[in-house]
């Protein structure tokens, strides 16, 4: 019995390590905006998940890849592509949660994907995905209140959600600062803090935040683009 437990623990640790390595690879593709490679990875991971449909982590990995693909599509201003990838990923994240409702990051990824539909298709996105995004991200924070990524995703959701729906940059900035407090070297949190500050016309502070983001992730093309587009004052 002890050997079985040790074997299971080893396999679980190996699976988590493989997932972390895959996520790092996807982040590198995201940083250089290699959308074709991200979409290829997402399609391949979705296909692999279909072959092992009872593996929640397989669906989760596919959802993560779709999220990065949607993110880059939005960065290069392809709203249709962003919506397509986000909706495909949300469906995979739902399957992961149906198999394992105990993983906080599954909810974080679902909320992120639902939130990514909103800037791609604001009216339909808010009506069809706004509530789902908020509920999933609230759940992720409830389950793991020390997750910087969950607060970051929650803040991005607020950033894209209109103020009359409870969103806006003020609420987003609070979440981004919480994420930074939990993970001071989070390049993504500093990036989004800079974007939100720029929206509030706090350009000097925005540039400082964007520069901080580049300090932690100098390869991120979109961060450099945002910094270049932000005036000094």
Which role does the model predict for each range below?
Residues 19-76:
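N-terminal leader/linker segments that initiate helical-solenoid repeat arrays
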Residues 31, 68-77, 111, 116-125, ...:
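Short coil/turn linking the two alpha-helices of tandem helical-hairpin repeats
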Residues 36-40, 75-91, 123-138, 165-178, ...:
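Structural signature of tandem alpha-helical TPR/SEL1-like repeats
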Residues 46-51, 91, 95-98, 138-142, ...:
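Conserved structural position within tetratricopeptide repeats
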Residues 56, 104-105, 148-149, 187-188, ...:
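Helix-start (N-cap) detector for alpha-helical repeat units in TPR-like alpha-solenoids
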Residues 170, 188-195, 199-233:
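Terminal, low-structured helical/coil segments at or just beyond the last alpha-helical repeat
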């Amino acid at each position: 019995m002890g050997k079985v437990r040790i074997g299971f623990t080893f396999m679980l640790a190996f699976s988590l390590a493989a997932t972390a390595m895959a996520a790092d690879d996807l982040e590198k593709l995201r940083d250089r905006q290699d959308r074709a490679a991200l979409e290829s990875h997402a399609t391949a991971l979705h296909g692999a998940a279909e072959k092992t449909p009872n593996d929640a982590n397989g669906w989760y990995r596919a959802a993560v890849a779709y999220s990065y693909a949607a993110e880059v599509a939005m960065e290069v201003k392809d709203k249709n592509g962003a919506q397509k990838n986000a909706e495909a990923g949300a469906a995979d994240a739902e399957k992961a949660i149906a198999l394992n409702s105990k993983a906080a990051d599954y909810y974080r990824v679902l909320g992120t994907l639902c939130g990514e539909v909103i800037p791609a298709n604001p009216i339909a996105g808010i009506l069809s995905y706004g509530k789902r995004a908020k509920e999933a991200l609230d759940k992720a924070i409830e389950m793991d209140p020390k997750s910087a990524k969950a607060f970051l995703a929650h803040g991005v959701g607020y950033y894209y959600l209109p103020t009359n729906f409870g969103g806006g940059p003020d609420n987003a900035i609070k979440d981004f600062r919480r994420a930074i407090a939990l993970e001071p070297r989070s390049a993504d949190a500093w990036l989004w803090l800079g974007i939100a500050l720029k929206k509030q016309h706090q350009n000097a502070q925005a540039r400082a935040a964007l520069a901080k983001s580049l300090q932690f992730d100098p390869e991120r093309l979109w961060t450099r683009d945002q910094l270049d587009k932000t005036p000094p004052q």
